[in-house]
Amino acid sequence: MCIIVILLAVVWILWSGEIRTILTIRQVGDNPYLYYMEYKASYDLDEVIAKDIDENAELLDYIVARIGKGLPIKAKSSQVADENGEVQTLNCTSFQARNCKGGFLYGRNYDYFANPTLITVSRPAKGYASIAASDMSHFGYSLDELPTSFKKKLLCLAAIYAPVDGMNEKGLCTSIMAIPHQPSQQNTPKHDVGTSVIMRLWLDRCATVGEALQLLDSLDVRHDASVGSGYHYMVADAAGNCVVVEFDKDDGWKTLTVSKQPEKNYMLVTNHLLSPKYYTTEPDPAVGNPNSRSWWRYATASEYLDAHDGVLSVDQALECLGLVHWDHLDLPNGKVEVTQYGNVYDQKRLTLRIRPWNQYDKYYDFEL
């Protein structure tokens, strides 16, 4: 009995945060592919930065080692390039608009395969609280492999490092959109961070767009070239400041930023570059993804936002996203894309409303 007590004490000492986190994981409502988690374990972004972890497999190995503390846990991401060396999915729509009730709304469609989604609330000891969405296929889950037992929930802990969009307690929001064939490969003496870690850093450490850009300038962002895609990001704060962050493929991947036009109440981004150096109103595979109808989505959502002068209710924000969502989009590589979810963050009231792909006529609400 004494040995058992000692072993239990050791387990609790080593994994108390992880255990307390796993105990919070639950299915949301009657949706078998939507989950919620409150992250209570420690994590060390400074260590990730110091190790220059910038590849997806490298990050997943680091996470698994940190979770397992020597135990043989395995995980594999589904986010890999096809036989042509590219990813033609992860094609999304994001916008910031004024909220008709005051403040700002941040709308987002996440277009990818039909995968389970995890909503994670984090309250780090040093940093801002946040709520974020993650595609669970990025850390080993699928429609056939779900977190239905304690053991199967272990890999949900990886979500803290892998948001695809989110909002923190200061109302700062961020999301990611794919740009095919253009993985940023910034290479200066600065430390490297990967695709999703920069977003976690923004959520944990930044209250404003200005702070987010300052943090960005202190690091090299390197997208995993093995995935076959690059990305740009939208960052928006509670005061209505909004930028799209891009990387200049023809000039050493220098950071480019596009700001919301002062005469507009909204800013919108899909899956083509907005920087004046590359922007075009006609589909061009050199600067975006025609396969996902990026330019059509941009024009369609812009028309709706212009018709409302960029001032929306939450329901209208969801309506706008609904105009450009996919039930079934056939891609040239033979795969089928859907809108995995559409969501709206209220940057003043700190709420999230989400519609998952398999219940797009229904929504779920969360509060930070």
Where do the language-model regions lie?
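Long, charge-rich alpha-helical interaction segments
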Residues: 281-318
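Hydrophobic H-region at the start of alpha-helical membrane spans
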Residues: 1-5
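Secretory/export targeting leaders with adjacent low-complexity proregions
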Residues: 214-227, 233
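N-terminal mature-domain region immediately after signal-peptide cleavage
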Residues: 6-207, 221-222, 306-368
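Extended amphipathic alpha-helical segments with heptad-repeat/coiled-coil character used for oligomerization
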Residues: 227-280
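Non-transmembrane alpha-helical segments in soluble domains
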Residues: 200-203, 213-216, 302
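A recognition module on extended beta-rich or small alphabeta surfaces enriched in W/G with H and D/E
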Residues: 128-140, 160, 266-288
